[in-house]
């Protein structure tokens, strides 16, 4: 049975340990920079082979708006905005709370090239995924997709030329009957 299964996409993902448990610099030592070869055989017997470069150039997460807990008018478009990502994660540095610190890529001898952004907006009824260019800085969600008194979670992904990506998550609610505190309560109840 397993011999007849195949893949349409392949992503290497894991549940990374908290930085307090395993500092990023140690985590990245497990996956050294360099070229990696992948080989496989399709169901029809054709051999596949690929070589990819793995880098430690990790873009910092985009700074996003609206701020978490913002309540928007459902009759108006919701505009998700972000700043251009110009910094990278410094794997050797964290702040007092164990969060990563961003720095100019030149400080680490790196070049950062944002290839594209992706925005995901979702709740129980919608799952919107939009791919955007590296020049784009906003996504407008039309009011036709918004419902009254509803929580929406969004993610803005910054995708680096190497394929590395970082996600910033946010959320907003629509009115007219929800307050910012209600919106926060809805998010925390997930």
Predicted stretch roles:
Residues 1-19, 124-131:
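Extended, solvent-exposed segments with strong compositional bias
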Residues 11-38:
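Ligand-binding face of N-terminal immunoglobulin V-set domains in extracellular IgSF glycoproteins
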Residues 23, 126-128, 134-142:
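Short S/T/G- and acidic-enriched coil/turn segments that sit immediately N-terminal to beta-strands
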Residues 31, 37-45, 143-168:
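Beta-strand-rich modules
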Residues 44-51, 159-189:
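Extracellular fibronectin type III
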Residues 46-63:
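Proline/serine/threonine-rich low-complexity linkers at boundaries of modular beta-sandwich domains
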Residues 72-111, 141:
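Conserved aromatic anchor
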Residues 115-119:
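Short beta-strand elements bearing conserved aromatic residues within extracellular beta-rich modules
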């Amino acid at each position: 049975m397993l011999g007849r299964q195949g893949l349409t996409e392949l992503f290497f993902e894991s549940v990374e340990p908290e930085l307090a448990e395993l500092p990023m610099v140690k985590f990245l030592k497990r996956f050294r920079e360099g070229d990696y070869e992948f080989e496989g055989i399709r169901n029809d017997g054709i051999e596949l082979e690929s070589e990819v470069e793995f880098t430690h150039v990790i873009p910092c997460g985009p700074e996003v708006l609206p701020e978490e807990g913002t309540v928007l008018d459902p009759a108006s478009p919701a505009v998700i905005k972000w700043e251009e990502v110009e910094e990278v994660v410094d794997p050797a540095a964290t702040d007092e709370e164990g969060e990563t610190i961003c720095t100019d890529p030149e400080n680490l001898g790196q070049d950062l090239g944002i290839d594209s952004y992706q925005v995901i907006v979702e709740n129980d009824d919608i799952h919107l995924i939009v791919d955007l260019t590296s020049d784009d800085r906003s996504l407008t969600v039309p009011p036709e997709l918004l419902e009254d008194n509803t929580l929406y979670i969004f993610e803005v992904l910054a995708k680096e030329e190497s394929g590395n990506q970082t996600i910033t998550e946010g959320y907003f609610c629509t009115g007219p009957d929800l307050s910012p505190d209600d919106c926060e309560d809805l998010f925390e109840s997930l």
